[in-house]
Structure formats: structure tokens, C-alpha cells
């Protein structure tokens, strides 16, 4: 049995890609997209029809060019998501514009709009996860959306405070970023030789997983942003793992046994009183890595969103 199939025995495997051909090849349960992945996929010739449809939608929407671009951008994200859903049995994650990361109300409005666009294409909201950055405002927006039956995936998650606040808000799923945590520490204090058990990104997800299970939070933990297969194998047993096509390929090519590393704890603890906004901001702010990586992640997604909009504007 190859390692990918071995992991699938214990963990739901999710494809971290906007490339539909890769998704079909590796047969994941779910798929995640973001502006960076959509920008990459939009440059591939085989997806030209999805872009043309989004452009036509933008023109039909009318208004200023800026409004047409915004409409086309939302439609493109939904077009890719709907196309991906034809190749997977589960859900696709579609991201809310990162520039709304500090605006609860506009994030809610955008999420409802994306769900509406999906429903116009015959896709039920039970097959969609709305991705939001795990800022305080993003977490509050997700809490409201969950009450409306719109499940959310909280991304750019780097601190324990972010994870705990998401669980307390009743968020459906979180995506703690293993690789970007590893990158930050590796640039400052390289782990040499590399020992996966000491990898700060792996340790972060393990701690979150254990805490959620010990306190009976139903929020799904989906490890994300991997740099090497060792990180993935060390988190086998995590609820879900979202993996890029290049690492899915590596795992599929290795014929080695896979051992489950994460197992729900039998120890149970009472849940603490939910964090206030002040407590969340203080706790998150104590983690220099998390503060830096969250703000950087939002900026980078916003840059790629603008590039995607420029690509669409040139065609309108």
C-alpha cells in the first residue's frame, strides 16, 4: 500500500489545489482553494472557459468597471469550486476576499453572496465551506454564518488563541498552517538535523488537536501548508489534512507502512469560559510568529486577489 492510501485509512485527505486535473488524479474527499491557487489555475489554458463565463457574468452585472471586476472575480471562484465538486464526493472551500479580514459585516455579506452564486449553479451549501482569515472579526463572522447553516473554514491560523477562539465560536473547521510556522522558526533557529517531532508547525497542530478532543469541541482540525511529507506523516490521524499535488505525488509513490500518530485523548476536561476580545488579542499578540504570519498571509492573499482582478479587468 502506498503512503497516500495509508494516510487515508486514518485521515480525510483534502487536495490543496485549484487544478482540477490534479484533483481528479489523487481522488481526495474535499478540496481547498484560495486566491493564490486560483491565480495559478487561471493561467492554464484548459480553464479558459471558466474565465470567459466569469467575464460574461461581470459584463451582465453592469455598473462601473470595478463593480464588474468584483462580480467576475466572485463568479470565477464559484466556477472553479463548482467544477472541482464534479470530481470529489465532499466539499470545496472558497475564500472570502482577504481585504475584508477586519470587517465582520462585509465578510458575512460576501459569504452569503458566494453561497447564493453556488446555489444558482445548483450547488447546495452543504457542499461548500466559506474560508475566512482567523482574525477576531473573521471568527465572529464565522460564528454568525454557522448559525445560518453556512459552514466555515478558518484559515491563516498560527496561534493557539486563534484555534481556541474558533472552537468557542462553534466554527466548523480550522486550518492550522504547519509549513509557514516551520518556515518562520527555520529562518531564525534552523532545526538541524531535522527531527519531525520537534517541528514547531507539527507541534502546534498536535497541541490544538489534543486540546479540542480533550474539551470535546466539534470543530474539525485540518492541518495545512506542508513543506515535506514527514510533516504529513507525523500528523496522520488528524481529522483532515489538506495537501498540495506535489506532496500527494510523493506520498503516492512511496510504498511504506503508515502509523497513526494522532489519537483522541481519553482524558476529558471542562471547557473554560470563552475568551473575550481583549483576552484573544492579548494571547494572540504574545506569539510573535503568529502575529507576523497572520498579517503577512492576509497581505499575500490580497496581492494575489488584486492580480486576479487585474487579469479579469484586462479581459472586460
Swiss-Prot record:
Subunit structure: Homodimer.
Pathway annotation: Carbohydrate degradation; pentose phosphate pathway; D-glyceraldehyde 3-phosphate and beta-D-fructose 6-phosphate from D-ribose 5-phosphate and D-xylulose 5-phosphate (non-oxidative stage): step 2/3
Protein name, UniProt field: Transaldolase A
Catalytic activity, EC: 2.2.1.2
GO molecular function terms listed in the Swiss-Prot or TrEMBL record: transaldolase activity
Role summary: Transaldolase is important for the balance of metabolites in the pentose-phosphate pathway.
Species of origin: Salmonella typhimurium (strain LT2 / SGSC1412 / ATCC 700720)
Active site, UniProt feature: 131 (schiff-base intermediate with substrate)
Subcellular locations according to the entry: Cytoplasm
NCBIfam families named in the record: PRK12346.1 (NF009001), talAB (TIGR00874)
InterPro entries reported for this sequence: Aldolase_TIM, TAL/FSA, Transaldolase_1, Transaldolase_AS
Gene3D superfamilies: Aldolase class I (3.20.20.70)
Similarity section: Belongs to the transaldolase family. Type 1 subfamily.
UniProt KW keywords: Cytoplasm, Pentose shunt, Schiff base, Transferase
GO biological process: carbohydrate metabolic process; pentose-phosphate shunt, non-oxidative branch
Reaction catalysed by this enzyme: D-sedoheptulose 7-phosphate + D-glyceraldehyde 3-phosphate = D-erythrose 4-phosphate + beta-D-fructose 6-phosphate
Pfam families for the chain: TAL_FSA
Superkingdom of origin: Bacteria
GO cellular component terms listed in the entry, alphabetical order: cytosol
Amino acid at each position: 500500500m502506498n503512503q497516500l492510501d495509508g494516510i487515508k485509512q486514518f485521515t480525510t485527505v483534502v487536495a490543496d489545489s485549484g487544478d482540477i486535473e490534479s484533483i481528479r488524479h489523487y481522488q481526495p474527499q474535499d478540496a481547498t482553494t484560495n486566491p493564490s491557487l486560483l491565480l495559478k489555475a487561471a493561467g492554464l489554458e484548459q480553464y479558459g472557459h471558466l474565465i470567459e463565463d466569469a467575464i460574461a457574468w461581470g459584463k451582465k452585472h453592469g455598473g462601473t468597471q470595478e463593480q464588474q471586476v468584483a462580480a467576475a472575480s466572485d463568479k470565477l471562484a464559484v466556477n472553479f469550486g463548482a467544477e472541482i465538486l464534479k470530481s470529489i464526493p465532499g466539499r470545496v472551500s472558497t475564500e472570502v476576499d482577504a481585504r475584508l479580514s477586519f470587517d465582520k459585516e462585509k465578510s458575512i455579506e460576501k459569504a452569503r453572496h458566494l453561497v447564493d452564486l453556488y446555489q444558482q449553479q445548483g450547488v447546495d451549501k452543504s457542499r461548500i465551506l466559506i474560508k475566512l482569515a482567523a482574525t477576531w472579526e473573521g471568527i465572529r463572522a464565522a460564528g454568525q454564518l454557522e448559525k445560518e447553516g453556512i459552514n466555515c473554514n478558518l484559515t491563516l491560523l498560527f496561534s493557539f488563541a486563534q484555534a481556541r477562539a474558533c472552537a468557542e465560536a462553534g466554527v466548523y473547521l480550522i486550518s492550522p498552517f504547519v509549513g509557514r510556522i516551520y518556515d518562520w522558526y527555520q529562518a531564525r533557529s534552523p532545526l538541524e538535523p531535522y527531527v519531525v517531532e520537534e517541528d514547531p508547525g507539527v507541534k502546534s497542530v498536535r497541541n490544538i488537536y489534543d486540546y479540542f478532543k480533550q474539551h470535546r469541541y466539534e470543530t474539525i482540525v485540518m492541518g495545512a501548508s506542508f513543506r515535506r511529507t514527514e510533516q504529513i506523516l507525523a500528523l496522520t490521524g488528524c481529522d483532515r489534512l489538506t495537501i498540495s499535488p506535489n506532496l500527494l505525488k510523493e506520498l503516492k509513490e512511496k510504498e511504506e507502512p503508515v502509523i497513526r500518530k494522532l489519537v483522541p485523548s481519553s482524558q476529558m476536561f471542562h471547557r473554560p469560559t470563552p475568551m473575550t476580545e481583549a483576552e484573544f488579542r492579548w494571547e494572540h499578540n504574545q506569539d510573535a510568529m503568529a502575529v507576523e504570519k497572520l498579517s503577512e498571509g492576509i497581505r499575500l492573499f490580497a496581492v494575489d486577489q488584486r492580480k486576479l482582478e487585474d487579469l479579469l479587468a484586462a479581459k472586460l
